[in-house]
Regions:
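Generic structural signal of hydrophobic/aromatic residues within well-ordered alpha-helices
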Residues: 1, 17-27, 32, 106, ...
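Sequence/fold signature of self-assembling virion shell proteins
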Residues: 2-24, 175-178, 183-291
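Alpha-helix boundary/N-cap detector
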Residues: 8-15, 19, 23, 97, ...
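Intrinsically disordered, low-complexity regions
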Residues: 9, 23, 44, 48, ...
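Assembly/oligomerization interface modules of large self-assembling protein complexes
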Residues: 18-101
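Context-gated lysine
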Residues: 29, 46, 75, 83, ...
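Alpha-helical scaffold segments that mediate packing/assembly in large oligomeric complexes
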Residues: 99-180
């Protein structure tokens, strides 16, 4: 059983106590580590906004060709108006992450080889990690909400075997490369470098990497770029144009406030984030339904 000391902290186990004298044995090394976050969806980050609040997405439709009529004075002299579509987004998630600490309390727990600055630095890291983890979970929620507006992949939206799933993913990726309006509002093609497959770690761990590379005709290095892994346990695979989903940032400001009368330090991170889903760009999903 862990030993609970009178300051409320928990020791690893009772063997840190000297059996002869009952005191805690000398600590020979103290490792200081902050909790870290990993955002596998940070490729959706569209950058920082310096001024303004409103995001405008503008899409220009593909022009319609006409048959050339020799001798005609109408069709090939009359150009149609460019068809431009716009969407506007202005809902920012304004938030602040913070942690406080007391230098004198930190000194009480450090050995002679450590400094308060080392601990303070890791506290600041933990603040940033908390913010990054929130963005990651927000993006997973955004995908789930956007799914309701997406059209499932038509060729085989519910493959029953892993082999069928891989073939369906390949078909979806190929379909995105051609000009069509099947999974977006207006006819367009998606450049290969903009296509991403978002898949759960639970599902991709069941797939043989060699078979995956062979089926999609890509090498292992390209797999990491094409596939974005998320820590979910569902069987939904999203195929998206990276422009269909994204987030912008503004007011990113990290600072530490010193409160001398209280002998306290507080680290803050201000960070506003705007998330969006735009159907001008292709997005679809496949649901793996094993037999």
């Amino acid at each position: 059983m862990p030993t609970i000391y009178n300051n409320g902290t928990t020791a690893a186990n009772t063997d840190v106590v000297n059996s002869a004298y009952g005191a805690i044995d000398r600590i020979y090394k103290s490792d200081i580590r902050a909790a870290l976050a990993f955002n596998s969806l940070n490729g959706f980050n569209k950058g920082a906004v310096e001024n303004g609040r409103i995001l405008e997405e503008m899409f220009i439709e593909m022009a319609t060709p006409y048959n050339f009529e020799r001798g005609s004075t109408t069709k090939y002299f009359t150009a149609e108006d460019a068809k431009i579509h716009t969407k506007y987004y202005g809902t920012w998630n304004e938030r602040q992450t913070s942690k406080e600490w007391y230098n004198y309390k930190i000194r009480e727990m450090l050995d002679s080889g450590k400094s308060v600055d080392e601990v303070a630095q890791q506290i600041v890291v933990s603040v940033a990690s908390g913010d990054e983890d929130l963005i990651y979970n927000d993006l997973k929620g955004l995908l789930l909400n956007a799914k309701a507006a997406m059209t499932p992949f038509a060729m085989n939206s519910t493959p029953a075997t892993l082999e069928d799933l891989l073939l369906t993913i390949r078909n979806a990726v190929s379909h995105f490369k051609f000009a069509n309006a099947d999974y977006c509002a207006y006819k367009s093609k998606t450049p290969t470098e903009n296509i991403r497959v978002i898949i759960s770690s639970y599902l991709i761990n069941q797939i043989d990497v060699v078979k995956l590379a062979n089926t999609l005709n890509i090498d292992r290095a390209e797999i990491r770029n094409l596939f974005w892994e998320v820590d979910t346990t569902d069987n939904v695979v999203y195929i998206v144009d990276v422009n269909a989903i994204g987030y912008f940032e503004k007011n990113f400001d990290a600072y530490t406030e010193v409160r001398r009368p209280l002998r306290k330090m507080i680290s803050y991170l201000d960070h506003d984030v705007l998330y969006y889903y735009c159907d001008f760009f292709k997005a679809t999903y496949i649901t793996y339904t094993p037999e």
